[in-house]
Amino acid sequence: DGLEFLRKLMPQYPMPVVVISALSEKVFDAMKAGAVDFVAKPAVADRKQLDSFLCNELPVKIKVASTARVSRYKKPVMFDNNYSTSSKSETNLIAIGASTGGTEAIAEVLKNFSTDIPGTVVVQHMPPKFTEMYANRLDSQCRVKVREAKNGDIVAKGEVLIAPGGDEQMSVVKIADNYQVVLKKGERVNGHCPSVDVLFNSVAEAAGSHAIGIILTGMGRDGAKGLLKMKKAGARTIGQDESTCV
């Protein structure tokens, strides 16, 4: 099948691959095998949706994927485990953002999280419905609890909340001693909804120096300005090493 073909193709002839997939967990196996990105398969019966897919979404994905450094896909993401107890006590919130190639990078980071890690919020650019499946997959692989975020969720210690794909932007606000998720319909920012910049900007305002911002692999600029805002607010900021990025 296509997945097995991809597993044999990439080690011998690395090339940019965009997967067109129905709602299935196999898409994440394809990403692990080296695919650069994926798009949700459109409903063939819906001519308007099909035209939009063929004329807009798919060409953009292919254009972006064509610039990917696929020869590096086999390099593992190394997570620095030198996360001291003192750092944990000072950090109340972690925010992670990723785009193209980010599904596996996020998984590698979260697998290193212990159950006492500060509450974590994540934006990974992904189509609607896939985010819940992705969260469930991560939950089965990690020590921390991972699930898709819902409006009003409290960001709790040892828990990771994944922003749902769709038409809602995810931000975080501080209420008393807690950080709360806000999901609100909004315009695309940097071409994305949810947007990493929207999340990072809100974390900078809500948590300031008590937050950590992590930007992982991606092909665009989403998250760059937000991470800078977090840094200026006193947060610790971390970026994935270029050699392991797509």
Label the predicted regions.
Residues D1-V246:
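Conserved acid/base catalytic micro-environments in cytosolic active-site loops
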